[in-house]
């Protein structure tokens, strides 16, 4: 994503991103991602912290996954995968395709707390 001085990816926006090359079982290829890093971070650095989105939904999902369904910009029922959170160069971001609804962003934050050990699983 080429950014002008005022343009930067914003928290809660969904972009297509190229996650290749990847190693081992990391999420890869061109796919939608959710920008989860703060606007201050995104504006002040060339990086963005993102969570990959997949349209392949397992039969059994856990609290570390967030189903986001299908909405404008995402034409397939999809799932966010906070376990695969990563920092990427903003140049990997391509087209903005959607905004994640606020209530879903709160679910993502809860899932991230589990993944990062910020809350107990008990």
Regions flagged by a language model, labelled:
Residues 1-122:
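Conserved functional hotspots at enzyme active or ligand-binding sites that engage polyanionic ligands
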């Amino acid at each position: 994503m080429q950014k002008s001085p005022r343009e930067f990816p914003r928290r809660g926006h969904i972009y297509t991103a190229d996650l290749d090359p990847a190693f081992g079982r990391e999420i890869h290829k061109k796919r939608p991602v959710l920008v989860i890093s703060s606007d201050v971070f995104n504006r002040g650095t060339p990086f963005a912290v993102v969570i990959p989105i997949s349209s392949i939904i397992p039969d059994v999902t856990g609290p570390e996954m967030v189903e986001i369904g299908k909405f404008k910009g995402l034409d397939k029922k999809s799932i966010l995968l906070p376990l695969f959170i990563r920092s990427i160069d903003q140049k990997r971001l391509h087209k903005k395709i959607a905004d994640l609804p606020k209530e879903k962003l709160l679910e993502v934050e809860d899932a991230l707390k589990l993944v990062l050990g910020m809350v107990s699983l008990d």
